[in-house]
């Protein structure tokens, strides 16, 4: 029996659970994931194999890095690119305004996940409830942002 951690680049359109199931079938090992990515998200999903599944609490609590793309002037009903546009237009902030604002996001704070998130409410993914017309209530959780860096800007 092999044990270890596989960092899988999960494609959009696949749930974290589906990714784990595929890896488990390919390896023949017990598998679990350390954290959940929303189905439409693309990103690294740490998959624990065999005896390494016991390390979940240690791996899941480690610091993570994200690369985000922001589109100013568009709002969707799901708060992500998968939703329907509910508003558009308005003033787009200058690069300097964005750079000046970044430090205000640093540190520890409480964050309430959006209704269309992979968080669970009574054992059901919030995005499933929201798609069925329910309004899931998600409890805020503590987040900590250690660093923010502007990488690039594209004007469309």
Residue ranges with predicted function:
Residues 1-156:
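Catalytic/RNA-binding core of pseudouridine synthases
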